[in-house]
């Protein structure tokens, strides 16, 4: 299997290297040696190399896309080295090994987010992907299909659950069900007469209406989206052409209406 490791505290470094071509044509081994040379002595001691994303290959100073099989004297690469804390990597590997699965490669979760939604239009532009996860929210910036930077916000769907549990004195499992099946993401899109009955921690049956539930959910979701919006501005100074939002929280009723209110309508 190929596993994705958490993106938090991942580091991105611009790298470059060049090698002399000794054979008749450039081989896969030449490319592998070039990439290895580009990261030599650049990975910090408590970090693990994840991948190198090539930005440009050059043969004798001329840009090329597919270099294997071509001829030349000097091969050069310019790319982005991605490394992650060893604890992020080994914690995931230990789980996979415990499940009896053989790990053949590792990647950062942000790359997986991109390849889930990738298309020709995204490959040509600069944009951001926001993954609203259970415990964390990952914000990643891509330039023409290349991951340029990523950051993790330590808030996610579980915080919505905890907000509901605290405000209504209910357990977090009931809170999660209310979030998924009853709440709306925006107070303009609610059913005024809908009521949800649930037992609180004292064993009493209470009745919740959509207005009070949605106000709590909307406040937390708006906070998450605004933090993600701010993080995009911190990750890149370039104008972005798209924002993709993924994750379980996007399934809450009227989520797109809240997104449009905060980001505008250029959101997938």
Question: Which stretches of residues belong to each language-model region?
Answer:
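Residue-level detector of high-confidence beta-strand sites
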Residues: 150-152
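A short acidic Gly-Thr/Ser loop motif
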Residues: 5-6, 129-136, 142-145, 154-158, ...
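A conserved active-site cap/scaffold subdomain adjacent to cofactor or substrate pockets
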Residues: 154-173
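Glycine-rich phosphate-binding loops at beta-strand->alpha-helix junctions
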Residues: 186, 239-262
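Phosphate/pyrophosphate-binding loops at sites that engage ATP/ADP/AMP, CoA/4′-phosphopantetheine
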Residues: 1, 225, 229-242
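Nucleotide/phosphate-binding catalytic cleft detector across ATP-hydrolyzing
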Residues: 1, 5-127, 147-148, 171-172, ...
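Residue-level signature of catalytic and energy-coupling elements of molecular machines
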Residues: 3, 96, 131, 164, ...
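Extended, folded domain segments that form the structural surfaces/walls around functional sites
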Residues: 28, 119, 131, 230, ...
């Amino acid at each position: 299997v190929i596993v994705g490791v958490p993106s938090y505290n991942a580091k991105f470094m611009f790298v470059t290297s060049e090698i002399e071509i000794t054979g008749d044509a450039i081989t896969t081994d030449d490319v592998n040696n070039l990439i290895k040379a580009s990261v030599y002595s650049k990975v910090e001691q408590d970090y693990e190399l994840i991948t190198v994303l090539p930005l440009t290959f050059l043969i004798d100073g001329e840009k090329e896309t597919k270099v294997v099989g071509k001829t030349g004297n000097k091969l050069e690469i310019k790319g982005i080295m991605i490394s992650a804390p060893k604890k992020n990597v080994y914690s995931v590997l230990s789980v996979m090994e415990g499940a009896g699965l053989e790990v053949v490669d590792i990647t950062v979760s942000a790359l997986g987010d991109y390849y889930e939604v990738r298309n020709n239009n995204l490959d040509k532009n600069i944009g951001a992907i926001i993954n609203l996860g259970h415990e964390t929210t990952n914000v990643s910036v891509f330039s023409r299909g290349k991951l340029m930077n990523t950051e993790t916000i330590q808030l996610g769907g579980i915080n919505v659950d905890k907000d509901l549990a605290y405000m209504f004195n209910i357990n977090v499992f009931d809170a999660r069900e209310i979030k998924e099946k009853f709440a709306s993401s925006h107070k303009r899109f609610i059913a005024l007469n809908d009521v949800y009955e649930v037992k609180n921690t004292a064993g009493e049956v209470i009745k919740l209406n959509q207005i009070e539930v949605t106000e709590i959910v909307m406040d937390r979701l708006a906070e998450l989206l605004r933090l993600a919006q701010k993080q995009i501005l911190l990750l890149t100074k370039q104008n972005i052409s798209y924002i993709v939002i993924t994750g379980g929280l996007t399934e809450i009723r009227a989520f797109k209406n809240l997104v449009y209110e905060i980001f505008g309508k250029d959101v997938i």
